[in-house]
Amino acid sequence: MPVSRFAVFGHPIAHSLSPRIHTEFGRQMGVALDYLAFDVAPDAFRVSLEHFVAEGGYGANVTLPLKEAAFEVCTTLSARARRAGAVNTLSRVDGVWHGENTDGIGLVRNLTERHGLDLRGRRALLLGAGGAARGVAPALLDAGITEMVIVNRSPERADMLCDALGEPGRVSARYWGDLGDLGNFELIVNATSIGNTSDMRTFSLPRSLLDSMTVAVDLNYGSAAVPFLAWAHAVETRYAIDGLGMLVEQAAESFSLWHGRRPDTDPVYTVLHSEYGVPGRS
């Protein structure tokens, strides 16, 4: 019986833990699979997918900066992916690509089930409006966030995300320069790649964003999460959480879509957190 082929596409991709996570899930569930990583620039993504299919590829995860490009290659989309305008999970169904987005449910599961947080009634600040932000925003709203303010260095993209979410009474877009005038938030989510370019000694956000209950969450993990979480520690947010748990949970959702069974995430998370987790408070 041939081994099923899966992959993760991104640019860069060398840091990705997805091959290891899915291999561990397969071992746990008794599923034989081959999971590869492909470093692909956006302009080569569609052709790379065609080669992947020709070589027996069945499903793929998609990370930055390809999530919106993945949305465009899909013939069918889940309601979550359509609402997000971004895809992180591709499945080959009847000769075409079906797109799903498991980022949001992965984040919510990590925050509510692993860290015991209640998201209902919270005021949230979402930093970023790209593929990562698009993936998590709908799920945060569905989890009960009362108000979401989206801030992005390119205000046009923030406006586009607000329009896509379709909830003008709960979601608004503001300029990055307005951060000091927005009041405080119970949840601050970093969905930018600023951790890849910022020195942890210079990254900062206004203290006026905080109250005594503020939870700071970075969708990145490892070294990319250090600047944001270092700031969170310095200003003493109530909790500071990196994106490793979300990564494992969204991977489990993808695995379930492909194989019909959801693996136990705790053993995989525990091992990876001991190796890659950024020290935090939770």
Swiss-Prot record:
NADP(+) binds at G128, A129, G130, G131, A132, L219, G243. One of its GO terms (biological process) is amino acid biosynthetic process. Pfam families: SDH_C, Shikimate_DH, Shikimate_dh_N. Pathway: Metabolic intermediate biosynthesis; chorismate biosynthesis; chorismate from D-erythrose 4-phosphate and phosphoenolpyruvate: step 4/7. The active site is at K67. InterPro entries: Aminoacid_DH-like_N_sf, NAD(P)-bd_dom_sf, SDH_C, Shikimate_DH, Shikimate_DH-bd_N, Shikimate_DH_fam, Shikm_DH/Glu-tRNA_Rdtase. Its EC number is 1.1.1.25. Signal peptide: none annotated. It catalyses: shikimate + NADP(+) = 3-dehydroshikimate + NADPH + H(+). GO terms for molecular function: NADP binding; shikimate 3-dehydrogenase (NADP+) activity. SUPFAM superfamilies: Aminoacid dehydrogenase-like, N-terminal domain, NAD(P)-binding Rossmann-fold domains. Keywords: Amino-acid biosynthesis, Aromatic amino acid biosynthesis, NADP, Oxidoreductase. It is an enzyme of class 1 (oxidoreductase). Homodimer. Involved in the biosynthesis of the chorismate, which leads to the biosynthesis of aromatic amino acids. Catalyzes the reversible NADPH linked reduction of 3-dehydroshikimate (DHSA) to yield shikimate (SA). This is Shikimate dehydrogenase (NADP(+)).
